[in-house]
Amino acid sequence: MIIHFHISYKTMFGEQIVVNIQKDNEEVKFPLTTLDGERWSYDWCVEPTQQAYTYFYSVVREGVVLKTEWLLVKHRLDMTAKKAAEYTLYDHWKVIPQDSYLYSSAFTDCINHQAPQEMKPCNYAKTVRIIVRAPQLRDGERLGLLGAGQVLGNWNLQNVVPMTQHIYNEWAVDLDATQLQSSHLELKFVAVDKKKSQVLWETGMNRTIDLPEMEAGEVVVYDLDQAFFALYNRKLAGTQVPVFSLRSKKSAGVGDFGDLKTMIDLVASTGQKVLQLLPINDTTITHTWTDSYPYSCISVFAIHPMYVDLHALPELKDAKARAAAEKKREQLNSLSQIDYEQVNDFKINYLHQIFEQEGKKIMSGADFKAFILETQQWLVPYAQYSYLRDKNGTADFTQWPDHNVWDEAERKDLTNPETEAYQNVELFYFVQFILNKQMQEAHEHAKAKGVILKGDIPIGVHRHSCDVWMEPKYFNMNGQAGAPPDDFSVNGQNWGFPTYNWDEMLKDGCQWWTRRFLNMSKYFDAYRIDHVLGFFRIWEIPVDSVHGLLGQFAPSLGMTREEIQGYGLNFQEDRFTRPFITDWVLDRMFHERADEVKEKYLDRLDDERYQMKPEVDTQRKVEALFADVTDEKEIWLRDGLYALISDVLFVRDRKNPELFHPRISAQLDFIYESLYDSDKVVFNRLYNDYFYRRHNQFWYGEAMKKLPKLVQATRMLVCAEDLGMVPDCVPWVMDELKILSLELQSMPKDPTVKFGHLSRNPYRSVCTITSHDMPTLRMWWDENISRTQEYYNTMLYREGPAPHPLPGWLARDIIARHLASSSMLCILSVQDWLAIDERLRQPSADAERINIPANPKHYWRYRMHLSLEELAASKEFMENITELIAQGGRI
């Protein structure tokens, strides 16, 4: 059989089109030929061995791939024409469409519920196949075509020619060419809803096709790109809540996957379509409350054991143990907040008892064996790491007496049930099997209810995590990831994570990231990329720093001395790169304790300046010196010493000591204050060029090396957290890859306005009022009275003084305005939803805060004060939400 490939694509001299075909579990590549650089073709002689072939085109120059088509929806050739001797394909180059979100599993699996079907075989002597994409169709609608002539239905709505959705959102139909009355076809596509007896015609002029002369056994395939219908864009509403914050009568002091199912039911009952969660990965480092930080995972694959639904497990057979467990569960569930340590001790102990009772039976089953086979790449090292962490009493594998790095040679023993090594780790296999099963069940439940589960991809991993232990080549351990100063933290954020070695990751096509995304797609149909700016550049902080002010972007383009001089600033290297400590600085900072600071912590450098003593010349040394201090005055002194150390105008490049970077937010420090006014003007110009213009093309290129691979790794809907210090290149990339942005009215991306205009939100965005890193709406309302007053008058268009605290009716108005925004998704925190009902909401607004980013030691323990059962029974509240969503057009 011969398959003739044809595609029109204008190339540059030296470029070539290549077709990449999936054949017999491998990818084969063939170069196309052209006479004019635009019309390309290739004839493939093949003995068909499969029912369908998928393929895509790419542009290659001298063996280097310059560009590929959109890979999420590849071309598909169904080999269903029984009498076919040859196929002639007329293809379109597939770019990422503006409505690419409609191809995500969020829409195809959760909202529309239309699974692809196999094309029926046809027995025509000559066949014309028509293919078109129709992503706009709603649940229950099918695509058909009508046109001139009997084969095309004679334009009669009673004779619509049905098409088959052979892949998601792509429809195909085979026509008997021998019955066509003319080689000139005129047709249109129609969307048919049989339940409503409605037919919708596509927009635009009639489509025409002029068929070539066809021989017997020939199949001509026309890709007609996309059918467009006059349908409004879908807008959806949802709730964001951490799993750990859920409360039910059955839970054990923390939300679990059983509670997640109940929350899905609640969300669905009000017409909401999205439920957004925080990361659910295992974070167990110390077995203390400091492990409560959900973004500091020890494995990007493993699930945290505390989310196990105990009621979904077999009952404990020992009556005494069962009664004791129930008593402890009730005690933990009565707490207003999560007691992380008690909850995890209880659940791990309970899982151990279930393992002793049911382990052999469950682990001998087919489901468990299939799970091991599917996950062993990460599961086996994770189990060994967890065992060694507990055995050695620390997760810092550099301190272990042996096994300081994962040894692949140990995998064999760790997967052999007869070995001692296996018996050491089998509990961890068992627990992850249970968690995987429960989370997948919750995911399937959400899809059945028409709810999109949206997960969260943390930007980093703990520096002593299993991922670093297993594959250290992917991580830079000589720095710390964080974020520059922003509305969340004036000193920047230091997350402590190692930064990524992207050069190493790109060598294998970002396989670690691809595995991570594929694993996540088992549980979610949408995800939030935490700190998407990190894929452009990450804020890298020296390991001896506590705050983020001494960081620099990586990668970045440092400045030479000559460049700095070129701006008109006399570069005094010693003065600008050493902490600027003088008598007047000390008096301003420490007041009556200035002399104490000079005596204890400083040495005289010259007639004007001081320097830090060697034992306190880094922030980490200061931190260690004050480690056991709890007195507020001493903490104030410690923070002052931190500030002295970061009081520099430039930081030296970490890789090349001959290059320099302006220190972030230097304008707020004493060294900037000491400059002449003319030098301040010059420095400001240099600073703005460096942070907002110098790197745009460079960072665009860095992001485009990584993000296209990652966003096309799965069909999950891609959303990004793009807040903070956002360079101009970020929206370029997000628009090119069709990634949803995050829009907060109180943190507008337009620097010229104080509050964003909701009607100007891009459609491809997620609108919210507050995030887990912010005060809730009620807290924000009372945080800054003058700001609230301005918002009340200018954004809510209300006269007079703003009421305090925030009344429920006004919270409802704010929510209604957000639901009416132009954003595709409006996802609000459960605390902000509850703000509309003064009888139900938490009496203390401060008790609703989930995280304080400025505090790296924050205890993540917020839990809903109401049970899910109580919420479900609050009919007036539930009806209120349903009404708000309907009025916002999000149904």
Segments predicted by a language model, with ranges:
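Aromatic-rich carbohydrate-binding modules that target alpha-glucans
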Residues: 2, 8-50, 60-81, 136-184, ...
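Short, surface-exposed secondary-structure junctions/capping segments
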Residues: 82-98, 215-228
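Catalytic cores of glycan-processing enzymes that make or break glycosidic bonds
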Residues: 103-129, 176-179, 208-891
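Residue-level recognition of alpha-helical structural elements
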Residues: 66-67, 77, 86-94, 100, ...
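Residues in well-ordered beta-strands of folded domains
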Residues: 6, 20, 58, 78, ...
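A short, Gly/Thr-enriched small/hydrophobic beta-strand-prone motif that recurs across taxa
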Residues: 1-8, 123-134
